[in-house]
Amino acid sequence: METVRLTIDNKTLEVPKGTTILEAAKSIGIHIPSLCYMKLEELHYENNPGACRICVVEIEGRRNLAPSCKQECTEGMVVYTHTPRVINARKTVMELLLSNHPAECLTCSSNGHCELQNLAHSLGIRQIRYKGEMSEFEIDRSPSIVRLSLIHI
């Protein structure tokens, strides 16, 4: 199996070729926040790897930030996961996501164990700078849609 050697936050490691930066960082205990796996239908947001941009990292020699969930590790790559530039980008992305999110956290069934809420808190977001009209989406009331609020377990 072919491997590549890289450095993440001053820790050198070797990973199989094709490993993403997110996977490599996780393998050495470095947490990079990501929302790729979250179900964000209530935001009307299709959450595919690389779409949310919360997991961006700085790669030495590149001008732009890269989504760690999509960027494969390359030989000699040097990655920084928590620089001021990275943190500011994550805050901006999170504020943009939250600006179109219903502000009903206190009455939400996920309150207290919501990854979105926890990430906003860890990034120090107390208010949203981006104001404006929220997106409006037609509610699908067809009989084939299962309404979770109607299911009692």
Regions found by a protein language model. Give the residues of each.
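Eukaryote-biased recognition of intrinsically disordered, low-complexity regulatory segments
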Residues: 1-9
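A generic structural signal for ordered alpha-helices
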Residues: 2-3, 47, 71, 133
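Extended, non-catalytic structural segments that build the interaction scaffolds
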Residues: 9-11, 148-149
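A generic secondary-structure micro-motif detector
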Residues: 11-12, 106
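N-terminal cofactor/phosphate-binding cores enriched in small/glycine residues
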Residues: 13-75
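Fe-S ferredoxin-like electron-transfer domains
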Residues: 53-150
